[in-house]
């Protein structure tokens, strides 16, 4: 039996969360075409390969920090590297290699990561010659354990990736019952809060999504009614953002709740009731106490 902790690392909006969802063939983490969607170091176990358990860590994209929340996000990436047995450095072939990619490799070097697989994603969008050139140029910058070219939407390519991971992690030497204790799951409450944030990210433009956090005030299931009740607060950092989130006549907050109920109906086989509030915590992204209160803890 093999076991390993595997971090997926790369610059913002490179497709780390999408890759993880494609591995699990369902949505286990939120994803968006906007950068900095992932805020937490999310660890979740995959055990669908024979004689192997992989604890994947989806990390925030490494980027130049603009506030204390950004510093926290970068610290999450570095914390994941400390505990990882293998790192996947994800590169999007449809984008140029830039300073953010360089910074990721620098961090990997600084942490003496010696078991790193370069994963070149979106190979379907490039010619063989272009892929070869990208592979050669990036491989000169770091001593990778292996290099893979994939299309993360391809089940065959994902299978190749999983088997490669299995090759590069160690045998588990403990008792099988102890291995069960090492498995990780995303809690329902955390997943719902992230789902709400994803809906908001995809519903608004510019800075508003990045100044939003979600607090689940109540989440309970009443078996006799087959009813799941979710009460939550949308936290914004400026008074001017509150009416934008609410919308004219409550139109936007209504849209958010309708989308949430529709998404949850695909997951939970029950009736769903949601109630939401919009609250202001001024400049919370620069307030360490509020950052912790909102669930972003090291």
Curated annotation (Swiss-Prot):
Region (G1): 10-17
Chain ranges passing through the membrane: none
Location of the Era-type G domain: 2-171
Residue segments, region G4: 121-124
One of the GO BP terms on file: ribosomal small subunit assembly
Compartments, as annotated in UniProt: Cytoplasm; Cell membrane
Region G3: start-end pairs: 58-61
Chain residue ranges for the region called G5: 150-152
GO cellular component, one term: cytosol
Residues that, per the record, bind GTP: 10-17, 58-62, 121-124
GO molecular function: GTP binding; GTPase activity; ribosomal small subunit binding; small ribosomal subunit rRNA binding
Bilayer topology: Peripheral membrane protein
Ranges where the KH type-2 domain occurs: 204-282
Taxonomy, superkingdom: Bacteria
Pfam family, one: MMR_HSR1
Biological role: An essential GTPase that binds both GDP and GTP, with rapid nucleotide exchange. Plays a role in 16S rRNA processing and 30S ribosomal subunit biogenesis and possibly also in cell cycle regulation and energy metabolism.
Family named by the database record: Belongs to the TRAFAC class TrmE-Era-EngA-EngB-Septin-like GTPase superfamily. Era GTPase family.
Subunit structure: Monomer.
PANTHER family reported in the protein's UniProt record: GTPASE ERA, GTPASE ERA, MITOCHONDRIAL
Name of the protein this chain belongs to: GTPase Era
Name of the gene this protein is made from: era
């Amino acid at each position: 039996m093999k076991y390993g902790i595997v971090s997926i690392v790369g610059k913002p909006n490179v497709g780390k969360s999408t890759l993880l969802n494609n591995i699990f063939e369902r949505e286990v983490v939120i994803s968006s075409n906007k950068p900095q969607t992932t805020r937490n170091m999310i660890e979740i176990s995959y055990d669908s390969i024979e004689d192997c358990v992989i604890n994947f860590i989806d990390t925030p994209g490494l980027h130049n920090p603009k506030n204390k929340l950004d510093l926290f996000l970068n610290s999450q990436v570095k914390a994941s590297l400390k505990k990882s047995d293998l790192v996947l450095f994800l590169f999007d072939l449809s984008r140029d290699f830039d300073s953010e990619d360089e910074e990721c490799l620098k961090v990997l070097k600084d942490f003496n990561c010696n078991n790193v697989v370069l994963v070149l994603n979106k190979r379907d969008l490039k010619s063989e010659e272009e892929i070869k050139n990208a592979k050669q140029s990036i491989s000169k910058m770091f001593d990778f354990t292996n290099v893979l070219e994939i299309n993360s939407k391809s089940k065959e390519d994902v299978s190749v990736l999983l088997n490669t991971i299995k090759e590069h992690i160690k045998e588990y030497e403990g008792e099988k019952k102890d291995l069960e204790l090492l498995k990780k799951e995303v809690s329902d409450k955390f997943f719902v809060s992230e789902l709400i944030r994803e809906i908001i990210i995809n519903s608004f433009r510019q800075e508003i999504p990045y100044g939003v956090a979600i607090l689940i005030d109540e989440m309970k299931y009443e078996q006799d009614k087959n009813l799941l009740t979710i009460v939550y607060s949308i936290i914004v950092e400026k008074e001017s953002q509150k009416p934008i989130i609410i919308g004219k006549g409550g139109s936007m907050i209504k849209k958010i709740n309708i989308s949430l109920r529709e998404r949850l109906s695909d997951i939970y086989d029950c009736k769903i009731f949601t109630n939401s509030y919009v609250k202001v915590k001024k400049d919370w992204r620069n307030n360490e106490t509020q950052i912790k209160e909102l669930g972003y803890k090291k």
